[in-house]
Amino acid sequence: MLKAIMVPLDNTTDSERRIAAAVTAAQKFEAHVLGVHVIPTIEHMMQTIPYMPYSVDILQDQQHILKTTAMALWDNFESSMTHAGLLFDRYQEEGDVQSYLKLYSRCADLTIINQNAGGKFPIVDDMTSFMLESGLPVLAIPEQSAYPTIGKRILVAWKDSAQCGRAVHDALPFLQMADEVIVLSVGEYDRKAVPAADICLHLARHGVTVEAAQGDIGDTPAEVILYAAENMNADLIVAGAWGHSRVTEMIMGGVTKSLLSNQRLPVFFSH
């Protein structure tokens, strides 16, 4: 069961979306919410946007704005948690954003992040790196204003790999509470691999209402996953985060990257 959910905070509409998703997930599991706000140092700002024509004075002004608007940020977070009847803690740090978020993610069962959106500087500036290095599950949410349900109908993207096995195990709290779960085999049939039917049997022993399905091998894995998820009206995809190396990511056809930017459905990733 999920008992602690971490949500990174900043002064953006993306932060409001993360809070909304955290509320939905926390109410589902009666979980504690950890709000984490990290104000980047000038040095970190310069590393994050090295090719932008910003002077130190401009960056100092930006840092000052972040500090002075922090109170409004916390008011919004606390109001959302209180209105939802949730228990919460708040943490504010100053330093390297990515490092602090990885640190606090290890004190939670799940971290809420945004899916990639072209042209934006996300609070987690390298989501794949964040997932691989934090070592704990994340919920990557699309650009929408509300998340009325997360995990009522779930598609599990299955491929016989350590990453997918870990994702299924970590997602058990969601899977056990779902009304419908489909385990979709992605890729060509491999007689030496663990089939989706066996994973379904394993999940059924945990009380999951589940069935197996086979994806169309004619399309890319990401397209197969998204089509099947939308066809069953899923509100969550569970997937292993593939990305040991650039070579591995190329071999997998960029599945993780594609799902991280699908902007249609929340994705539960684990590695």
Predicted regions and their residues:
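Small/aliphatic-rich secondary-structure junction motif
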Residues: 1-56, 133-136, 150-215, 234
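Structural beta-alpha unit
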Residues: 40, 75-111, 206-237, 243-250, ...
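A short acidic, glycine-rich active-site loop
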Residues: 55-71
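Hydrophobic alpha-helical segments and helix pairs
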Residues: 85-143
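Structural alpha-helical scaffold elements that stabilize or flank donor/cofactor-binding regions
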Residues: 101-104, 130, 174, 230, ...
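Glycine-rich, Arg-bearing micro-motifs that act as flexible, cationic patches
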Residues: 113-130, 239-262
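Short, flexible loop segments at boundaries between secondary-structure elements
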Residues: 148, 262-271
